[in-house]
Regions:
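Hydrophobic alpha-helical transmembrane segments of ABC transporter permease domains
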Residues: 41, 53, 59, 92, ...
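Membrane-integrated ABC transporters
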Residues: 1-50, 65-78, 95-100, 104, ...
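An intracellular "coupling" helix at the cytosolic face of ABC transporter transmembrane type-1 domains
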Residues: 124-125, 141-150, 154, 158, ...
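Helix-loop-helix
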Residues: 71, 170-184, 258-328, 334
Length: 601
């Protein structure tokens, strides 16, 4: 849905917006001015070679061939000059292309760094509403289109500009009157370029959006492959993909037909008109006196090169439109305001005792109803507060606010008496250990997945942390132990093993606040028994907020909060809640009888 809305917005991009995108793209060249100047000099040399080549042929035709004045020395000089121009042009062309490629690659490299950096500053709301495939498309495909613009469009524009100026200078030098007549074709050329630019832009915008939708569908299918196969969704997804792919094909065919209609025939028409003008002019001249054949050749050759330059510009307009469209999509991310919740960064706001207070906190996701309503509780330093409730009751939302993934609308969260908004985000994350139900693992090895590239963490600390959470036992059975390779998302490990590694990752940072999001939900009973002792030791001296699926794991919690529809409906210790024989008591009894917690509610 987001991609389609974006397409509608871009189809009405104004001229001012178009210029702003171009200006912003060109701003990336400011660090490459010396290289661009040098490349411009090389382009000028190539242009001069193209301009002087017809003059050498003209001299040969008019001064030597027509009057039959075949002086060998002069012919050798002309031949050597023409050959030298051709070889020199080829050498200079190589370096010109090399420099343009280098500049383009460096610009796109910086642009990708900028957009990747920006993505990591955005809040979770942005990722909730934007398909992952669309984001990947912008970082890869769209920046690649920008690279093509600098390599092909910018180089062609500079070269064509020099070529047009050089050609007209040579034409005026040869025959002022005919050069003036040729200017009559300019309005037609400008009109064709205007029409081509106006209509081709729509096709290229649509193509970029369809490509983004293709990437989004592919990413969705791959990330959910197990569900797709389990529920026999392959045929449905293939049909959806075929539809998007067909739309992409249809847009591409419309663009090809438009190019075939306007590029080739239009340029051929202008060339035919130019030849008619030249032949008519020299035909009239021949009635008065002799006509220089070399001059006729030079003019036709110049018009051929002139129209070739125009054709190249029009052909590159397609790339230009694609690059403008792609760049506007990239800049939309860079201009995105849905950033990580802002922090006041009060220097006096330090986490020392780790006392946590929720005061009448209410929160809603994008455009929805409140998922948390007036939540209030206090976790004293070193205490464990457990959150229980059915799916959608608001447990994970409390964790998300605690980690500052989202901004809450009303109320406040205090840590050691200071608003959570006052703490530096880096300190807050550093002193808070988070263990999720679905633990994520990166490419690399077990060592780096526990250390997370923190050079201050030693190998000894990694081993101690793994032993602390009972992960060392299974790691020692692996062939490379702590250097054992981890593939994407740790797919070669069981859920329990991934969870144990995530425990070690948290313990090794020695956090003051511990947040457990159903951390033992994916652990089998035997493994859970192994880590319960470790978790109990880990909670000692740390303020802990834990979402519990198995109520048996939170009997020793200092405070248990029972949530339903975003509200706290019961609170107390395990014993007091059991004695009250309310919702928690029913949940506990039903779960002990083997029923699921959600079924209990």
């Amino acid at each position: 849905m987001e991609a389609m809305n974006e397409q509608d917005e871009m189809l009405v991009m104004s001229g001012k917006e178009h210029r702003e995108v171009l200006k912003r793209m060109l701003s990336y060249t400011k660090y490459h001015i010396p290289s661009l100047i040098w490349t411009g000099v090389l382009v000028l040399l190539v242009t001069l070679a193209d301009v002087f080549a017809p003059i050498l042929i003209k001299i040969f035709l008019d001064d030597y061939l027509t009057p039959m004045n075949l002086e060998m020395q002069a012919l050798l000089i002309l031949g050597a000059g023409y050959l030298g121009l051709t070889i020199g042009k080829s050498i200079v062309w190589y370096f010109q292309l090399l420099y343009f490629q280098k500049i383009a690659l460096e610009i796109v490299q910086q642009m990708r760094i900028d957009i990747f950096t920006k993505l990591h500053s955005l809040g979770m709301r942005y990722f909730d509403k934007t398909p992952a495939g669309s984001i990947v498309s912008r970082v890869t495909n769209d920046t690649e289109a920008v690279k093509d613009m600098f390599i092909n469009v910018l180089s062609t524009a500079i070269q064509s500009l020099f070529m047009l100026v050089g050609i007209y200078a040579a034409m005026f030098a040869l025959n002022v009157q005919l050069a003036l007549y040729s200017l009559l074709l300019f309005p037609l050329i400008v009109f064709i370029i205007f029409v081509y630019r106006k209509y081709s832009s729509q096709f290229y915008r649509a193509r970029r959006e369809k490509l983004s939708q293709l990437n989004a569908k592919i990413a969705e299918s791959i990330s959910g492959m197990s569900i797709v196969q389990q529920f026999n969704q392959e045929r449905r997804l293939v049909k959806e993909f075929e539809k998007i792919n067909k739309d992409y094909y249809d847009v591409g065919m419309k663009n090809i037909k438009f190019n075939a209609l306007l590029l080739g025939p239009a340029i051929d028409l202008i060339y035919a008109l130019a030849v008619v003008i030249i032949l008519s002019f020299f035909g009239a001249e021949s009635l008065i006196g002799p006509v220089a054949i070399g001059t006729i050749y030079a003019f036709i050759s110049y018009f051929d090169r002139f129209l070739e330059a125009i054709y190249n510009v029009m052909e590159r307009l397609a790339m230009y439109q694609e690059a403008i469209t792609a760049a506007s999509r990239v800049f939309r991310i860079m201009d995105e305001t849905e950033e990580v919740p802002a922090q006041l960064n009060d220097p006096e706001a330090k986490i020392t005792r780790a006392k946590i207070e929720f005061k009448d906190v209410s929160f809603a996701y994008e455009g929805g109803r409140d998922v948390l309503k007036n939540i209030s509780f206090t976790a004293e330093p070193g205490q464990t507060v457990a959150l229980v409730g059915h799916t959608g009751s608001g447990k994970s939302s409390i964790i998300n606010l605690m980690m500052r993934f989202y901004e809450f609308e009303r109320g406040d969260i205090l840590i050691d008496g200071k608003s959570i908004k006052s703490h530096e985000i880096a300190e807050l994350r550093k002193k808070t250990g988070l263990v999720l139900q679905d633990s994520f693992m990166f490419y690399g090895d077990i060592n780096t997945n526990i250390r997370l590239y923190d050079k201050n963490i030693t190998d000894e600390q990694i081993v101690d942390a793994a032993k602390f959470v009972q992960a060392d036992g299974f790691i020692q059975t692996l062939s490379d132990q702590y250097q054992h390779k981890v593939i994407e998302r740790g797919a070669s490990f069981s859920s329990g093993q991934r969870q144990l590694i995530s425990f070690a990752r948290t313990v090794v940072t020695n956090p003051q606040i511990l947040v457990l999001d159903e951390a033992t939900a994916n652990i089998d009973t035997e493994t859970e028994n192994l880590i319960q002792t470790g978790l109990k030791r880990m909670r000692e001296g740390r303020t802990t907020i834990a979402i519990a699926h198995r109520l048996s794991t939170i009997k020793d919690a200092d405070l248990i909060l029972v949530l339903s529809k975003g509200r706290i409906i019961e609170r107390g210790t395990h014993d007091t809640l059991i004695a009250e024989q309310g919702v928690y008591h029913s949940m506990y009894q039903l779960q002990n009888s083997g029923m699921d917690l959600d079924a209990a509610l």
